[in-house]
Amino acid sequence: MKFTLVGNGRMGREVAAVISRSGIHETAAVLDVDAKITPDSFRGSDAIIDFTVRDAFLQNLDAMLASGVPVVAGTTGWDDVRAGVASKVKAAGGSLLYSANFSLGVNIFLRTVREASRLIAPFEQFDIAFSEQHHTAKADFPSGTALAAAEHILAANSRKHSIVRQLPDGRKIQPDELQVAAIRLGGVFGKHTAFIDSEADEIVISHTAKNRSGFASGAVETAAWLALRHKTAPGFYTMDDFLNERLA
């Protein structure tokens, strides 16, 4: 398959390297984040893989959808307009798969955290919190993966109703709040940890990325899946859709 990459940063270059090593896929084009993008920019592509920034992704979305080429969106930071993006995809008859993290390891981790949250829900002696660490150049805070994990925790645990990113001085966290802490440090690729605590014990579930290849490989694999899916069932997808089909 042929993929057009939008974004030539660290992730874009890693995706290009994975495609080159695959022996079965090709890079049709690489478009810089500030390039003038039109529907013709994606001619001859089987899928688009976007790793840019929020503003560029939202600005280029109409052109990507108008091209008729399915889009894999690895750009984060636009959860507040997610419903609007999904509506645009549907109206255009297009396909878009969004994930804050395409690493298969991370997505297995997220499912593990959700199951752990479900298991402790009936037992009030257990509380849960979440933290993430990334390199100092990462812009969004907390990470999209951390927010995805928080959504999993809230969905599985009726005792947690809202996310707290920072506590004002002098205010204690409430029992129905889930704290999501973020640390920016050095060149950390990404570390996500769920902490489950009681008076008797502590359970720690953690995922550490050793490099970016897992993210890039997952993006290429899901792009190939979406290119085929788009032919018969266009729509707005997530990694859960991809994993559910693979695990069926």
Swiss-Prot record:
GO MF terms here are:
4-hydroxy-tetrahydrodipicolinate reductase; NAD binding; NADP binding; oxidoreductase activity, acting on CH or CH2 groups, NAD or NADP as acceptor
Just give the chief location class: cytoplasm
Gene Ontology CC annotation, any one:
cytosol
Is Secreted one of the keywords?
A: no
- HAMAP family from the xrefs? DapB
Instruction: Show the PANTHER family listed in the entry.
Output: 4-HYDROXY-TETRAHYDRODIPICOLINATE REDUCTASE 1, CHLOROPLASTIC-RELATED, DIHYDRODIPICOLINATE REDUCTASE
Hey, which pathway is this one from? Amino-acid biosynthesis; L-lysine biosynthesis via DAP pathway; (S)-tetrahydrodipicolinate from L-aspartate: step 4/4
Catalysis performed (reactions):
(S)-2,3,4,5-tetrahydrodipicolinate + NAD(+) + H2O = (2S,4S)-4-hydroxy-2,3,4,5-tetrahydrodipicolinate + NADH + H(+); (S)-2,3,4,5-tetrahydrodipicolinate + NADP(+) + H2O = (2S,4S)-4-hydroxy-2,3,4,5-tetrahydrodipicolinate + NADPH + H(+)
| This enzyme's EC code(s) | 1.17.1.8
Residues that coordinate or bind NAD(+): D32, G74, T75, T76, S99, A100, N101, F102
Q: Which domain of life is it from?
A: Bacteria
- SUPFAM superfamilies xref list: Glyceraldehyde-3-phosphate dehydrogenase-like, C-terminal domain, NAD(P)-binding Rossmann-fold domains
Q: Which UniProt keywords apply?
A: Amino-acid biosynthesis, Cytoplasm, Diaminopimelate biosynthesis, Lysine biosynthesis, NAD, NADP, Oxidoreductase
As for subcellular location, the record says: Cytoplasm
Similarity-based family: Belongs to the DapB family.
Q: What is this protein called?
A: 4-hydroxy-tetrahydrodipicolinate reductase
Catalytic residues per the record? H134, K138
Annotated residues that bind (S)-2,3,4,5-tetrahydrodipicolinate are located at H135, G144, T145
* Record gene name: dapB
Extract the Pfam families matched here: DapB_C, DapB_N
Species per Swiss-Prot/TrEMBL record: Chlorobium luteolum (strain DSM 273 / BCRC 81028 / 2530)
Q: Which GO BP terms sit in this record? A: diaminopimelate biosynthetic process; lysine biosynthetic process via diaminopimelate
Q: What is this protein's function per UniProt?
A: Catalyzes the conversion of 4-hydroxy-tetrahydrodipicolinate (HTPA) to tetrahydrodipicolinate.
**Do the record's keywords include Zinc-finger?**
no
